[in-house]
């Protein structure tokens, strides 16, 4: 307490009596303890108290957090892993639809406790978010029309007159903005899709990663996939959390270490054809 505050209390005690002073001090002490208790309720404690883990997902992310448009059922490695995590915590998972352009708002505005849709670790994101250890790692893939004239290799992408589409907010946006020298880069905002840009002819190709390229190969009959050369960057994927409290992050870290050791991560990666990009160490 500062000097002026103490002097004010002494004046109050002389004017209204010592009993009043005691009551005031008791009230201030109670308020202080209440504030302290509130401040010490960690993210993990809230999850446990509410019996609910709010996990942000991108329901278009094939083999990661994909919602089947016909059955509305969710599947993917991160659906399986979050169910395992929830089981260990003794809570249920509530999946919150999101996407990469909403990533910061979803976490910072407390719409979810953790983003669990294979978030690529980038310098920009590290400045605003906390990340778990990596569990996947992917390079880039270009998706174009089968037998499209002049588009058979990676080198044919960055040419004058070419249009390359990326989903806004994805790590591909930053990578391609730096690497493209001749082609035009188009950022696609939801509800628009990269596929629509290519199918309509507005773009020659769109950029994606290994998991999403599986969707194009397995669910379409028009897509050709071109992998990036070895000199292009790869990105590690992890779970993301808002800055500040790290209690849930530490618990997820322990969980990821365990599923790497006991084989569950590799098991789920194989189930969803992601074993070529799984990170086990």
Which residues does each predicted region cover?
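Flexible hinge/capping segments at coil-to-helix
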Residues: 145-162
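A ligand-binding cleft/hinge motif common to bilobed small-molecule-binding domains
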Residues: 102-105, 119-127, 175-178, 199-233
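Ligand-binding cleft/hinge of the Venus flytrap
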Residues: 65-71, 82-91, 154-158, 172-189, ...
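Short helix-initiation/N-cap motifs at beta->coil->alpha
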Residues: 79, 95-105, 152, 186-196, ...
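Ligand-binding clefts/hinges and TM-proximal coupling segments of bilobed small-molecule sensing domains
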Residues: 41, 171-186, 224-228, 257-281
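Periplasmic-binding protein-like
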Residues: 59, 136-144, 210, 214-257, ...
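Extracytoplasmic small-molecule ligand-binding "clamshell" domains
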Residues: 40-118, 127, 271
């Amino acid at each position: 307490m500062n000097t002026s505050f103490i002097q004010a209390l002494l004046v109050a005690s002389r004017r209204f009596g010592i009993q009043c002073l005691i009551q005031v001090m008791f009230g201030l002490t109670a308020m202080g303890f209440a504030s302290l208790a509130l401040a010490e309720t960690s993210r993990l404690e809230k999850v446990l108290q509410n019996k609910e883990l709010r996990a942000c997902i991108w329901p278009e992310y094939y083999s990661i957090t994909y919602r089947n448009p016909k059955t509305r059922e969710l599947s993917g490695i991160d659906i399986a892993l979050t169910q395992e995590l929830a089981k260990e915590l003794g809570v249920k998972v509530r999946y919150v639809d999101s996407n990469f352009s909403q990533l910061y708002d979803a976490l910072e505005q407390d719409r979810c406790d953790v983003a669990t849709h294979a978030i690529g670790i980038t310098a920009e994101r590290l400045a605003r978010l906390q990340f778990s250890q990596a569990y996947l790692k992917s390079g880039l893939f270009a998706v174009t029309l089968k037998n499209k004239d002049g588009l058979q290799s990676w080198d044919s992408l960055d040419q004058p007159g070419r249009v390359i589409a990326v989903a806004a907010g994805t790590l591909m946006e930053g990578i391609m903005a730096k690497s493209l020298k001749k082609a035009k880069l188009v950022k696609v905002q939801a509800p628009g899709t990269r596929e629509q840009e290519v199918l309509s002819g507005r773009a020659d190709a769109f950029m994606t990663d290994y998991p999403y390229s599986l969707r194009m190969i397995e669910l379409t009959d028009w897509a050709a996939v071109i992998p990036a050369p070895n000199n292009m960057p790869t990105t590690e994927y992890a779970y993301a959390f808002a800055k500040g409290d790290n209690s849930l992050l530490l618990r997820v870290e322990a969980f990821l270490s365990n599923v790497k050791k006991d084989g569950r991560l590799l098991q789920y990666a194989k189930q969803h054809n992601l074993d070529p990009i799984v990170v086990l160490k």
